[in-house]
């Protein structure tokens, strides 16, 4: 028999899971999401991607600023949920909320726990050069991503993969995993295992100060840095354009042959020297402009061989 669920999520990453649980036939009593925020040129209040999808599905949406009041707890309990599914909600759940559903609260986390607990597991996995990532369903407790694990799926991280690529792949994989987990919970057969005490690491929130590219690092490290911050906040450097240093974000690149001083342009195809080897820029973005391929950029803004790219 389908479960009665409360779904809690906010960004695009959570939308596939909401859709998959709804398509499975679970009774989603309510969707909790973060409050609307100003966005766009007019800075009008906009609901989160999850809230918009829930409204389209006809599911009641709640956007409380806190869950730590008696009123918020009473409202949450009023849904009489069998379980809560939490995917990138963006708010820490107090113990009283965790205890409210009959069968508990279950979180979809975008890493292979206990590695990369915390806010930015996808970015940190790519930036650290991890060979793989994945998604895990865990039964939540009051710790930071410390709950017992129910199910997991893995995915390889390639040199060509940006955070956007990994995000989209894990969102799809995670939706299927959560459907399987809730089906097992429905049957009474969901098995839990404690997380290992070894290999614990924390994925700190990305700081914009990290975005500056240091071409004095090895090419592989520069590539991982760029792909781990693409598209947001976007790893940047300054290109000499019309006599000025113009900041551009490099969104996608590849390892390339060549040697030179770090930051030196090795050709007319946006190949830039690093401490060892080089990277070739594949996609970039100027401030206020749309992302474009390197070929599109160079048609309007040729960059000569031998010039130096700065990241001051």
From Swiss-Prot:
Swiss-Prot/TrEMBL keywords: Protein biosynthesis, Transferase
Name under which the protein is recorded: Methionyl-tRNA formyltransferase
Domain of life: Bacteria
Function: Attaches a formyl group to the free amino group of methionyl-tRNA(fMet). The formyl group appears to play a dual role in the initiator identity of N-formylmethionyl-tRNA by promoting its recognition by IF2 and preventing the misappropriation of this tRNA by the elongation apparatus.
Catalysis: reaction(s): L-methionyl-tRNA(fMet) + (6R)-10-formyltetrahydrofolate = N-formyl-L-methionyl-tRNA(fMet) + (6S)-5,6,7,8-tetrahydrofolate + H(+)
Binding, (6S)-5,6,7,8-tetrahydrofolate: 111-114
GO molecular function: methionyl-tRNA formyltransferase activity
Enzyme Commission numbers on file: 2.1.2.9
Keyword set includes Lyase: no
SUPFAM superfamilies for this protein: FMT C-terminal domain-like, Formyltransferase
InterPro entries in UniProt: Fmt, Formyl_trans_C, Formyl_trans_C_sf, Formyl_transf_N, Formyl_transf_N_sf, Formyl_transferase-like_C_sf, GART_AS, Met-tRNA-FMT_C
Pfam families in the record: Formyl_trans_C, Formyl_trans_N
Hydrolase among keywords: no
């Amino acid at each position: 028999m389908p479960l009665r669920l409360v779904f809690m999520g906010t960004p695009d990453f959570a939308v596939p899971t909401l859709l998959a649980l709804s398509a499975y036939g679970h009774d989603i009593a309510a969707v909790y999401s973060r409050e609307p925020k100003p966005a766009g040129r007019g800075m009008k209040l906009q609901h989160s991607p999850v809230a918009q999808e829930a409204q389209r599905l006809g599911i009641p949406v709640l956007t409380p600023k806190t869950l730590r009041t008696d009123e918020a707890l009473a409202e949450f309990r009023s849904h009489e949920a069998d379980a809560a599914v939490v995917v990138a909600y963006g708010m820490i759940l107090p113990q009283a909320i965790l205890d409210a559903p009959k069968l508990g609260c279950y979180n979809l986390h975008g890493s292979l726990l206990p590695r990369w607990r915390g806010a930015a597991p996808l970015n940190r996995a790519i930036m650290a050069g991890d060979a793989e990532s994945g998604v895990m369903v865990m039964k939540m407790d009051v710790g930071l991503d410390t709950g017992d694990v129910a199910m997991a799926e893995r995915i390889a991280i390639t040199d060509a993969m940006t955070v956007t690529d990994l995000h989209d792949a894990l969102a799809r994989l995670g939706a299927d995993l959560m459907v399987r987990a809730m089906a097992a919970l429905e049957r009474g057969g969901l098995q839990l295992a404690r997380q290992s005490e070894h290999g614990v690491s924390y994925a700190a929130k990305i700081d914009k100060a990290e975005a500056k590219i240091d071409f004095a690092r090895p090419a592989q490290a520069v590539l991982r840095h760029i792909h781990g911050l693409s598209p947001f906040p976007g790893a940047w450097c300054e290109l000499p354009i019309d006599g000025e240093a113009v900041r551009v974000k490099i969104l996608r690149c590849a390892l390339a042959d060549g040697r030179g001083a770090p930051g030196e342009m090795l050709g007319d195809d946006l190949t830039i020297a690093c401490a060892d080897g080089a990277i070739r820029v594949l996609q970039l973005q100027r401030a206020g402009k749309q992302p474009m391929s390197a070929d599109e950029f160079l048609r309007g803004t040729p960059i000569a061989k031998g010039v130096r790219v700065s990241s001051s």
